[in-house]
C-alpha cells in the first residue's frame, strides 16, 4: 500500500481533507476564510482533519510567492528551525483572487523539530568527502551546498554536484551527515535521457539563432533578443565554443543542440512567459560530442547545461537531433527550479514523465515515440512510447507498478523506478492530450508542475494537482477528463492505491 500526500480543501467555513474530490463540489467562502501571508500558520493549525499543532505550524515560513495568469496566488512554505531548513516536504497554500484559501498541497509535518546534533565538518569538509567518493573525477563543481536537518534533529548537508567541462559527465545529489561525515544518501542523475543567422537542423528545418561573426568564421554563442545567452561547446575539443569558417562547415550535432535549445527556450517564453529555464534568464548551455570517456550515446541535464554524447552508431544521429529529447532535458531544468521533484521513486517518475510529456508537446505532439528522430541502423526505435509504454517494457497501470525495476543489462536499480514507472503517468498524460488537445493539456501540465507539486509528490498528488489546474483554468468538464485518465491507470478516488509486489523486472531502455 502507498499513501500519497493529500490536497486539503476548504468547504464553507470549515476545512476538510480528501484525495479524491473532483473540485466540482468545492465551495470557497471568501468572506469567512481569508488569511494574510502572515497568518499561514493559522491555516495549517485549523485544518479540520489534518490540523497540526500551532507550535509545529509556526515553523513554516513563506519562501516563495507567485501569481498565475488566472489570478490565483500560490504561497510556498518551508519548515525551518533555528534558521535551518527541515528536510520535509514543502507546503503550498493556494488562494483565489480575493485572497481566500482554496486548497493546500503538500504534507504538513505535525512535529516541532529541534536540532539535536552539531555540525562538525562544515562546507569544506563535505567537499572533501564528496571528492574522495569520486576519485576519478578531478574537477567537481559544487552547484549547491545546503545545510538541513531531518525530523530526528540530525544536521546534514544536501549537495548538488556536477563536473567541470573538462571532467567526465557527473550529476549527483548527496546527503552527508554533518556530525560524522557519513554519506547518508547518494543519487546519480547522470543517465537521463550577437547577431542572428538562420541555421538548419539535421532535418533541414530552419531556426534563427544568435551567433558571433568574425573574419575567421562563425561561433555558436551569443545573446538573443530577450537578453538570454546561448552557447554550445565541444566535448572533444577542450570544451571550447563551437566554431567554423562558414555556416555549412559547422558541426551538425552542435547546430542541432543550439537550434533546438533556442526553440525550447522560446516555447516556454511564448506559452508561459517563462524567462529561460530558471525564469531568471539563465544561460542556455549545451555540450555536444560528450566523451565518457569514449563515445557517450546518451543525454542528461547536469544542473547548469544539457550534455549530449557522441553517438556510438556512425550512421546515426545524436540525441541533440531529437527536439523532444532536448525539450525533455530542458524541462528537467524547469522542474529543478519549480516543483523540485526528487529524483527517487514516484516523485522521480513524475520528474521523468513531465519531461517526456513536455518534450512531446514541444516537438509538435506528432510522434508518441520519444527520441524517434535519433533512429539509425543500430538504434531502431526511440526510448519510450507515450501512447503504448509497454512497447518498451514499461507499465501502463498501477497494477504493473514496480519500484525495483532495473536498467537493462545492469545490476543497478532505477532510482526506485524513475524511468520504468514513468510509463504510467506518460500514458495518462497522452490520454489527456488526445482528449483535451495540446493547448489545454500543456497549460494543465505546466501549471500543476510549477504551482501545485512539491518535491516529494506521489502519483496521487499529480492527479490532485492536474485536477486543480484543470478546474481553475477550464472548468469541471476538463477536470472530469483528467480524472478519467488517472482512473484508467488505477490512480483514482481512493486514498490508498493498490500496487503489485516488487519483482526483479528489468528496464528495457535507458
Curated annotation (Swiss-Prot):
Catalyses which reaction(s): Preferential cleavage: Xaa-|-Leu, Xaa-|-Phe, Xaa-|-Tyr, Xaa-|-Ala
One function term, GO molecular function aspect: metal ion binding
Signal peptide: 1-30
One GO cellular component term: extracellular region
Catalytic center residues: 329, 419 (proton donor)
General function of this protein: Metalloprotease capable of the hydrolysis of insoluble hydrophobic substrates. Hydrolyzes azocoll and gelatin and, at a lower rate, soluble and insoluble collagens. Does not cleave short synthetic peptides. Preferentially hydrolyzes the 24-Phe-|-Phe-25 bond in the insulin B-chain, followed by the 5-His-|-Leu-6 bond. Inactivates endothelin-1, primarily by cleavage of the 5-Ser-|-Leu-6 and 16-His-|-Leu-17 bonds. Hydrolyzes the alpha chain of C3 to generate a C3b-like protein. Inhibits complement-mediated hemolysis and opsinization of bacteria.
Family: Belongs to the peptidase M4 family.
Highest rank taxon of the organism: Bacteria
Protein's name according to its UniProt entry: Gelatinase
pH dependence per the UniProt record: Optimum pH is 7.2. Active from pH 6.0-8.0, activity decreases rapidly at more acidic pH values. Stable only above pH 5.6.
Ways its activity is controlled: Inhibited by L-leucine hydroxamate and phosphoramidon. Not inhibited by phenylmethanesulfonyl fluoride. Reversibly inactivated by straight-chain aliphatic alcohols.
Subcellular location, principal: secreted
Keyword tags: Calcium, Hydrolase, Metal-binding, Metalloprotease, Protease, Secreted, Signal, Zinc, Zymogen
PANTHER family: BACILLOLYSIN
Amino-acid positions noted as binding Ca(2+) in the UniProt annotation, renumbered to this chain: 324, 376
Organism this protein belongs to: Enterococcus faecalis (strain ATCC 700802 / V583)
Origin organism lineage: Bacteria, Bacillati, Bacillota, Bacilli, Lactobacillales
Localization (cell): Secreted
A Pfam family matched in the record: Peptidase_M4_C
Amino-acid positions noted as binding Zn(2+) in the UniProt annotation, renumbered to this chain: 328, 332, 352
EC number annotated for this UniProt entry: 3.4.24.30
SUPFAM superfamilies from the UniProt entry: Metalloproteases ('zincins'), catalytic domain (SSF55486)
InterPro entries according to UniProt: FTP_domain, Peptidase_M4, Peptidase_M4/M1_CTD_sf, Peptidase_M4_C_domain, Peptidase_M4_domain, Zinc_Metalloprotease_M4
Amino acid at each position: 500500500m502507498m499513501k500519497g500526500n493529500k490536497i486539503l480543501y476548504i468547504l464553507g467555513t470549515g476545512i476538510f481533507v480528501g484525495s479524491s474530490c473532483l473540485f466540482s463540489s468545492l465551495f470557497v467562502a471568501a468572506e469567512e476564510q481569508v488569511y494574510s501571508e502572515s497568518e499561514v500558520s493559522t491555516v495549517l493549525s485549523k485544518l479540520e482533519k489534518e490540523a497540526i499543532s500551532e507550535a509545529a505550524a509556526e515553523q513554516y515560513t513563506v519562501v516563495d510567492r507567485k501569481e498565475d495568469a488566472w489570478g490565483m496566488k500560490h504561497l510556498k512554505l518551508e519548515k525551518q528551525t533555528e534558521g535551518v531548513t527541515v528536510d520535509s516536504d514543502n507546503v503550498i497554500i493556494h488562494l483565489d483572487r480575493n485572497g481566500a484559501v482554496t486548497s493546500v498541497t503538500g504534507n504538513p509535518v505535525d512535529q516541532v523539530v529541534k536540532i539535536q546534533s552539531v555540525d562538525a565538518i562544515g562546507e569544506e569538509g563535505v567537499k572533501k568527502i564528496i571528492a574522495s567518493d569520486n576519485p576519478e573525477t578531478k574537477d567537481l563543481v559544487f552547484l549547491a551546498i545546503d545545510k538541513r536537518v531531518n525530523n530526528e534533529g540530525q544536521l546534514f548537508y544536501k549537495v548538488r554536484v556536477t563536473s567541470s567541462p573538462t571532467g567526465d559527465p557527473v550529476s549527483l545529489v548527496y546527503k552527508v551527515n554533518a556530525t560524522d561525515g557519513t554519506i547518508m544518501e547518494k543519487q546519480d542523475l547522470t543517465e537521463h535521457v550577437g547577431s542572428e543567422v538562420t541555421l538548419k537542423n539535421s532535418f533541414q528545418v530552419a531556426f534563427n539563432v544568435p551567433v558571433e561573426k568574425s573574419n575567421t568564421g562563425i561561433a555558436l554563442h551569443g545573446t538573443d533578443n530577450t537578453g538570454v545567452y546561448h552557447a554550445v561547446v565541444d566535448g572533444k575539443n577542450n570544451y571550447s565554443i563551437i566554431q567554423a569558417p562558414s555556416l555549412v562547415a559547422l558541426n551538425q550535432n552542435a547546430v542541432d543542440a543550439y537550434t533546438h535549445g533556442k526553440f525550447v527556450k522560446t516555447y516556454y517564453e511564448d506559452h508561459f512567459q517563462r524567462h529561460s529555464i530558471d525564469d531568471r534568464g539563465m544561460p542556455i548551455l549545451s555540450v555536444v560530442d560528450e566523451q565518457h570517456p569514449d563515445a557517450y550515446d546518451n543525454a542528461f541535464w547536469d544542473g547548469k547545461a544539457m550534455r549530449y554524447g557522441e553517438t556510438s552508431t556512425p550512421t546515426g544521429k545524436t540525441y541533440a537531433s531529437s527536439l523532444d529529447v532536448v525539450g525533455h532535458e530542458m524541462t528537467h531544468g524547469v522542474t529543478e527550479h519549480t516543483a523540485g521533484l526528487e529524483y527517487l521513486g514516484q516523485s522521480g517518475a513524475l520528474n521523468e514523465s513531465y519531461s517526456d510529456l513536455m518534450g512531446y508537446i514541444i516537438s509538435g505532439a506528432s510522434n508518441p515515440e520519444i527520441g524517434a528522430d535519433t533512429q539509425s541502423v543500430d538504434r531502431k526505435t526511440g526510448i519510450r512510447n507515450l501512447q503504448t509504454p509497454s512497447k518498451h517494457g514499461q507499465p501502463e497501470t498501477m497494477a504493473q507498478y514496480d519500484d525495483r525495476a532495473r536498467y537493462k543489462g545492469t545490476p543497478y536499480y532505477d532510482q526506485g523506478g524513475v524511468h520504468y514507472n514513468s510509463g504510467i503517468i506518460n500514458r495518462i498524460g497522452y490520454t489527456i492530450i488526445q482528449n483535451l488537445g495540446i493547448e489545454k493539456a500543456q497549460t494543465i501540465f505546466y501549471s500543476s508542475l510549477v504551482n501545485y507539486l512539491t518535491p516529494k509528490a506521489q502519483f496521487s498528488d499529480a492527479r490532485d494537482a492536474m485536477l486543480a489546474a484543470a478546474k481553475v483554468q477550464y472548468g469541471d468538464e476538463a477536470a472530469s477528463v483528467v480524472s478519467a485518465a488517472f482512473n484508467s491507470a488505477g490512480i483514482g478516488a481512493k486514498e490508498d492505491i493498490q500496487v503489485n509486489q516488487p519483482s526483479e523486472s528489468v528496464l528495457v531502455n535507458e
